UniProtKB/Swiss-Prot annotation:
It comes from Legionella pneumophila subsp. pneumophila (strain Philadelphia 1 / ATCC 33152 / DSM 7513). This is Small ribosomal subunit protein uS11. One of its GO terms (molecular function) is rRNA binding. One of its GO terms (cellular component) is ribosome. Located on the platform of the 30S subunit, it bridges several disparate RNA helices of the 16S rRNA. Forms part of the Shine-Dalgarno cleft in the 70S ribosome. Belongs to the universal ribosomal protein uS11 family. Keywords: Ribonucleoprotein, Ribosomal protein, RNA-binding, rRNA-binding. InterPro entries: Ribosomal_uS11, Ribosomal_uS11_bac-type, Ribosomal_uS11_sf. The gene is rpsK.
Length: 132
């Protein structure tokens, strides 16, 4: 006779790290804005995008959509206990300034703001001019 043991699932409660200071990476392209909160080592804690916040098409590339995405990511970052951030802005998109403004509104202490947009040393040919 086989004796059946009742297997009990051992579930451990996930311990959330406390990260008091971190980095905010803002990738602002012409079509979308991606906001990522990381710790000092660069490990991603949370992120949000304009498209993931419910905006589609041309509304996705507006400063308001970037503001809403920042609001969503900041709410999760506050659960980690984040208070002060360094901001790295990448790209020429319309969500650059509104994202930083929203971080100030969310009561984050901004330690530094750095623009890390890549500058081509005569790299790729730019797209042709629009004829409207």
């Amino acid at each position: 006779m086989a004796i059946t043991k009742s297997k009990q699932q051992k579930t451990r409660k996930k311990v959330k790290r406390v990260v008091s200071d971190g980095i905010v990476h803002i990738h602002a392209s012409f079509n979308n804005t991606i906001v990522t909160f990381t710790d000092r080592q660069g490990n991603a804690l949370c992120w949000a995008t304009s498209g993931g916040s419910g905006f589609r098409g041309s509304r996705k590339s507006t400063p308001y959509a970037a503001q809403v995405a920042t609001e969503r990511a900041a709410a999760v970052a506050k659960e980690y206990g984040m208070k002060s951030v360094a901001v790295f802005v990448h790209g020429p998109g319309p969500g650059r300034e509104s994202t930083i403004r929203e971080l100030i509104t969310q009561d984050f202490k901004i330690v530094e703001i750095t623009d890390v947009t890549g500058i081509p040393h005569n790299g790729c040919k730019p797209p042709k001019k629009r004829r409207v």
